[in-house]
Structures are given as C-alpha cells and as structure tokens.
C-alpha cells in the first residue's frame, strides 16, 4: 500500500486526511503546534491533530519544520508521497524531493489565480461567481508548482467564506481521491501555470476589515461575506467598533450620504457610496455578543436616528 505523509492544520484539511486514511497508509501527520485560543488562552490542538489521533496516526508538531530535528526523521520514513492541505509553512526541497512520487498540495483556488494563504477570502472579496480546488506539485516557491488536476464549484449570493471553506474542503478531498490512482500510475501529465495569469491572495490586513461606506454597495456586500465568519468586517457607530457578520444587498438607488441609516422598528439599512443599500442581518456592537438584527433593533438600535451615520 502507498505510504503517505500528510501535512495540514485547520478544519479545511480534515476531510482530506480522513479520505486519504480510508484508502492509503498514512504513516505520519505533520501539523502546527497547539496554540492558545479564546479569551482564556486555552492551549488548543489544531483540528488535524485531533483527527489524526482519532485515526491512530503518529503526529509531528514542529514550530519550524525547516530547522527542526523532526525534518530528518520524516525523510527517513521513506514515504511514497507527501500530501499537504493548508499546512502553513514553506517546505524545504530536501523534504519535497524525498518521496518516490514527490509532494503534492490541495489548494483552494483555480490556480494560477489566488496563490497564497487566503484564496477563499479573495474569491468572495472580488465577487467571483465560481472558484475551485487545484491539486499541484509542491515546489519551494509559494503555490507555483505544475497543476495535476482541477475542479470548479459555483459561489452563490448566499455563500460566505465559511460556507465556501466547507464546500471546498469536501471538494478537495473528492478531487484528491479521484486524482491519486492515475497520478500514482504515472498517467497524468502536469500542466505549468501561466505566469501571465498569476494573482496572489495575501493574508487579510486589519485595514481590509474596515468598511468604507463611500464604496459601491456590491463591493461592501462582497467585503462582508468575504470576511465572514473571520476576521469579520467592521464599521464604527458613534466612534465605537460595530461588526457586521452577515448582510444582504439591495440594488435600489437611494438618496443619502454614504453611511446614512434608514431604519424602521425591526430593520436597519445603510446607504453605500452608489446609493444602494446594505441590510445587516447579524451584527455585533462594541462590547456585546453577536446578535441578529431584530434583537439589536428591539434594544440599543431603538435609539438610532436618521442623523446618525456609520463610519463616523
């Protein structure tokens, strides 16, 4: 049976690991170290570690794989194939070249578009109507390897980064399992990425999280769903942070300055730069838990007036 080393960290990677382990001999799992999580900073293992332990697979958690003693140990396992999915570190050539069939990666975009660590976020932020998963060879340069297989999936108006992560995670596992038999048999010819079509999905900055109400409504709507459920788009209300977790978009022109509030007793609408409307459905005022808009409007939201503007 083909011996595989798997490397991954977040929940996105778990279905890939589980599918691999159901059909192949996964001899080791490499993931990031346990990290403090939440307000109480409780040391928490990555989702992949939990899954690997449940499957009875040995787990390695080097802080920096490139300089760790575990690197040589992994090479000495003489795996037939290395598979990665959102591991989180650049891998050295000594490891990439050690398996018989090399190293391949499950990447959540239609390469060469969106190389980098936040491809799902950017597909939503840019208003794409489809994205997908690419299986490609691993090289030292970030997400630059030749492509082995690719599969597309639509993005709907109701999707956000969270829903697309779930869909792409399952799609990636399915595509990998469909690809591996022919790949291991040497029946697939990989295709180089077109350098003219390369784009990057760098990690989201704090500046990208803040809503600019002078922008078109469609752009703001894509920002909200592209940053949900993490890190979450925010604006300010009376100079305090105000997160918008979920919203809908109304493509109707309305008069009013950007950030102007239109409200009745149960709904809240905010004017965007082109006069269209953002209609928040799940929000989080400063110092409060996340709540649906009806709860907000029956409480603190009752005090909002038409002279109040978001972003001020």
UniProtKB/Swiss-Prot annotation:
Its EC number is 2.1.2.9. InterPro entries: Fmt, Formyl_trans_C, Formyl_transf_N, Formyl_transf_N_sf, Formyl_transferase-like_C_sf, GART_AS, Met-tRNA-FMT_C, Met-tRNA-FMT_N. It catalyses: L-methionyl-tRNA(fMet) + (6R)-10-formyltetrahydrofolate = N-formyl-L-methionyl-tRNA(fMet) + (6S)-5,6,7,8-tetrahydrofolate + H(+). Signal peptide: none annotated. The keyword Magnesium does not apply. (6S)-5,6,7,8-tetrahydrofolate binds at residues 109-112. It comes from the Bacteria. HAMAP family: Formyl_trans. Belongs to the Fmt family. This is Methionyl-tRNA formyltransferase. It comes from Listeria innocua serovar 6a (strain ATCC BAA-680 / CLIP 11262). The lineage of its organism: Bacteria, Bacillati, Bacillota, Bacilli, Bacillales. The gene is fmt.
């Amino acid at each position: 049976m083909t011996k595989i080393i798997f490397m991954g960290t977040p929940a996105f990677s778990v279905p890939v690991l589980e599918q691999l382990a159901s059909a192949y001999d996964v001899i080791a799992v490499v993931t990031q170290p346990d990290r403090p999580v939440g307000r109480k900073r409780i040391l928490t293992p990555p989702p992949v570690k939990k899954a690997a332990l449940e499957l009875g697979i040995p787990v390695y958690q080097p802080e920096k794989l490139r300089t760790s003693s575990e690197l040589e140990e992994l090479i000495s396992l003489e795996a037939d194939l290395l598979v990665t999915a959102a591991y989180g570190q650049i891998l050295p050539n000594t490891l990439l070249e050690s398996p018989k069939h090399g190293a391949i990666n499950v990447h959540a975009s239609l390469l060469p578009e969106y190389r980098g660590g936040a491809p799902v976020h950017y597909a939503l932020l840019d208003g794409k109507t489809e994205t997908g998963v690419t299986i490609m060879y691993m090289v030292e340069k970030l997400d630059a390897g030749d492509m082995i297989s690719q599969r597309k999936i639509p993005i709907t108006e109701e999707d956000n980064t969270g829903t697309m992560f779930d869909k792409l995670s399952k799609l990636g596992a399915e595509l990998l399992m469909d690809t591996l038999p022919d790949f291991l048999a040497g029946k697939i010819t990989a295709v180089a990425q077109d350098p003219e079509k390369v784009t990057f999905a760098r990690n989201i900055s704090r500046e990208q999280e803040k809503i600019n109400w002078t922008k078109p409504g469609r752009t703001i709507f894509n920002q909200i769903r592209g940053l949900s459920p993490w890190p979450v788009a925010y604006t300010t209300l009376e100079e305090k942070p105000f997160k918008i977790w979920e919203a809908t978009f109304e493509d109707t022109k309305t008069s009013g300055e950007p950030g102007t509030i239109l409200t009745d007793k149960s709904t809240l609408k905010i004017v965007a730069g082109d006069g269209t409307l953002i209609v928040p459905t799940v929000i989080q005022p400063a110092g409060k838990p996340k709540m649906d808009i009806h709860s907000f409007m029956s409480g603190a939201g009752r005090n909002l007036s038409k002279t109040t503007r978001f972003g001020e």
